[in-house]
Amino acid sequence: MDDTAPIDWKRNLYIAWLGCFFTGAAFSLVMPFLSLYVEQLGIQGHEALNLWSGVVFSITFLFSAIASPFWGRLADRKGRKLMLLRSALGMAIVMALMGLVQNIWQFLLLRAALGVLGGFVPNANALIAIQVPRNRSGWALGTLSTGAVGGALLGPLLGGYLADTFGLRPVFFITAVVLFICFLVTFFFIRERIEPVREKGMLSGRQVMVSLQNPHLVMSLFVTTLIIQVATGSVAPILTLYVRELAGQTDNLAFISGAIAAIPGVSALLSAPRLGKLGDKIGPERILVAMLILSVLLLIPMAFVQSPWQLAVLRFLLGAADGALLPAVQTLLIYHSSHQVAGRIFSYNQSFRDVGNVTGPLLGASVSASFGFRAVFLVTASVVMINAFYSWLSLRRKSNRELVSEAE
């Protein structure tokens, strides 16, 4: 293949979307029965089972947060395609090994390894972000985000069916095959023109931030990513219990809870490309602030709903707003960083996202234990409202600085 030929960024986008879909599906395939597998490995008793289930779930995000900056640095040196291949193949091997474990410690170690070797989605975001024309980046990143969301929606349904049909362990092997397909698709169809940077010429993490035109804004975007994940995860531990409180006695609690849990993903699939395209026209910063404010306005009434269907409608609308948030953040990150450091900027953002994935459920569980289920939505709304104000100030400061520069 001619390395000087122009890269078809749209083809790369669609292939990366497929890879993100496979990765999202693979990760979520095992989620419906994670606690059951922990129990199968010898953990007995309600408290012990809850504790170990929480630990094996969280440890993946913790190790991902630690490892992401290292992989981002390597991506800036060796290219993003190599990181995609490393991630897909590494996760495939780890998933296959998970199907062979004999005790909880082996499983815990492999869940940590999964976090270390992960990172397909942020590297796909970085790859597409630096290849796409700037005036199409909102649409492109919004479209790409629907891949992982779509996979994450399908995964639990398929995983539950496969576990019921074949048992728990075979699902890990099936997941490994899905990830290996992702590796093959990436290897044969993704194209990248690499401009290698020597280790000697690499900037340190501090130098990367100093080299940015607006490091304060970039840091505020990292914080926004963290808050988005905190807001998403804070409801997860209490959602089924809250639905049970709203529904009363019902025979299909699992179905209703599952539908209400999944419905934001459906609306995010519909909204992300459209709002991303709108962001290309009016500016991603306007989309970001508007959707943060809309999220606050939707979270508050969730604390006062009287039926599961009222909650479902609000969560559908919230998903439409949430679907635009991370693509808007990623678009702004690429606007305010050079291609030479894009890998690390996206990896730092992933670390903040992973921290949010861990702290969100902890916040929700602690607030609900102290003040009840409804308080979780009010506390989450307060956190998002503070972040919306902080984001507005940061973006306004950036706009004022640009006006001063133009005047000079």
From Swiss-Prot:
Q: Which GO terms describe its cellular component?
A: plasma membrane
UniProt keyword list: Cell inner membrane, Cell membrane, Membrane, Transmembrane, Transmembrane helix, Transport
Cellular localization per UniProt? Cell inner membrane
List, alphabetically, the Gene3D superfamilies matched. Answer: MFS general substrate transporter like domains
Which residue windows are transmembrane per the record?
13-33, 51-71, 89-109, 112-132, 138-158, 170-190, 221-241, 253-273, 287-307, 375-395
Give the domain of life. Answer: Bacteria
Please tell me whether the keyword Transmembrane helix is annotated for this protein: yes
The protein's topology relative to the membrane is: Multi-pass membrane protein
Q: From the UniProt record, which GO molecular function terms apply?
A: transmembrane transporter activity
> What NCBIfam families does this protein map onto?
PRK09874.1
Family, according to the entry, reads as follows: Belongs to the major facilitator superfamily. DHA1 family. MdtG (TC 2.A.1.2.20) subfamily.
Query: What is this protein's record name?
Result: Multidrug resistance protein MdtG
Taxonomic source organism: Dickeya zeae (strain Ech586)
Q: Which gene is annotated as encoding this protein in its UniProt record?
A: mdtG
